């Protein structure tokens, strides 16, 4: 990215169903004010200048799923200049590691949110919402699609 003031650039992603040839939707980065609710940036479509790593450190390797969320939230809290692009920068096939480990992702997102969010109850509230959504999704899949 040519603008030297931009330290992190996040773009859009085309989302594909498994083995599909056409995307079924485009995911856009959300406004940065959404950090307390979950990751607003699309990790695979995000580029970070080397100087940012020198300034705020690397990803937290103790986090299996949410290391990217923690890093970007830390960057945001340290006033790193984060910009969005409307361009699709990557194609993603659904069913990745986060999708396959929703409970761990929800737990780690709560941990990260608790560390950085100024409203300390919000990460726990969002964690509860994610868990309820996951339980409903599992119930619907098992009862209406016959999966076990």
Task: State where each predicted segment sits.
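A recurrent flexible, glycine/aromatic-enriched loop bordering the glycosyltransferase active site
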Residues: 16-23, 29-51, 55, 70
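Accessory recognition modules or surfaces
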Residues: 32-33, 37-38, 96-105
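A short, conserved alpha-helix in the catalytic core of glycosyltransferases
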Residues: 40, 46, 52-57, 62-91
């Amino acid at each position: 990215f040519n603008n030297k003031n931009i330290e992190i650039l996040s773009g859009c992603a085309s989302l594909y169903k498994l083995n599909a040839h056409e995307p079924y939707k485009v995911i856009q980065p959300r406004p940065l004010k959404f950090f307390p609710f979950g990751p607003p940036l699309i990790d695979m479509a995000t580029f970070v200048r080397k100087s940012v790593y020198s300034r705020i450190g690397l990803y937290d390797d103790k986090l299996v799923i949410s290391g990217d969320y923690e890093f970007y939230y830390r960057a945001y809290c340290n006033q790193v200049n984060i910009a969005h692009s409307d361009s699709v920068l990557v194609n993603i096939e659904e069913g990745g590691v986060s999708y396959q480990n929703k409970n761990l992702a929800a737990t780690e997102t709560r941990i990260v949110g608790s560390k950085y969010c100024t409203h300390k109850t919000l990460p726990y509230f969002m964690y509860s919402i994610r868990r309820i959504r996951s339980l409903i999704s599992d119930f619907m899949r098992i009862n209406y699609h016959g999966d076990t």
